[in-house]
Amino acid sequence: MGRYSREPDNPAKSCKARGSNLRVHFKNTYETAMAIRKMPLRRAVRYLKNVIEKKECIPFRRFNGGVGRCAQAKQFGTTQGRWPKKSAEFLLQLLRNAESNADNKTLDVDRLVIDHIQVNRAPCLRRRTYRAHGRINPYMSSPCHIEVCLSEREDAVARVAPTDDAPAKKKLSKKKLARQKEKMMRE
């Protein structure tokens, strides 16, 4: 069992999955992972399937040099987006693995949220390509390590309404407080 970069807050209500040295582009996978971070599990699976079918795009925010614009990226507040099919398939497989781990721990799968997802660079794999005049250039691949942690969503606690007998205090800015103090000092 490998070491995870972050342990969940409540290990009894969470599950983990990871993949090492995966032959999928690091940059595309990073952007795909950032798009599904903090999503509910069901929505993330549906979103990745839509990416594979090119119905929704992955917004490219960090590694966006030379990435073309697409209209589907507008819903994320950006202009650049792509449909990294292989990255989506690898992440979908990892989410299914984490979901089966959740079933094994008897967690409620419908309440799972992607609490933590991280993509790290793995050691590059070298190949070579032959060029003109007897030269040889490197032909590198950029694999990655992926880890994901799912947690059950906590129920939101309802806020207690203020009672009528105690009036709610009005919040004042620092400027107004200073003016009030000045008035008090003058009087």
From Swiss-Prot:
Example GO biological process: cytoplasmic translation
Protein name: Large ribosomal subunit protein uL22
Keyword entries, A-Z: Ribonucleoprotein, Ribosomal protein
Record's compositionally biased regions (Basic residues): 169-178
Coiled-coil positions: none
Entries under PROSITE patterns matching the protein: RIBOSOMAL_L22
Record's keyword annotation contains Ribosomal protein: yes
InterPro entries given in the database record: Ribosomal_uL22, Ribosomal_uL22_CS, Ribosomal_uL22_euk/arc, Ribosomal_uL22_sf
Family: Belongs to the universal ribosomal protein uL22 family.
NCBIfam families according to UniProt: PRK04223.1 (NF003260), uL22_arch_euk (TIGR01038)
One Gene Ontology term, aspect cellular component: cytosolic large ribosomal subunit
Organism: Bombyx mori
Gene that encodes it: RpL17
GO molecular function, one term: structural constituent of ribosome
Record region (Disordered): 161-187
Top-level taxonomy: Eukaryota, Metazoa, Ecdysozoa, Arthropoda, Hexapoda
Disulfide bonds: none
SUPFAM superfamilies named among the record's database cross-references: Ribosomal protein L22
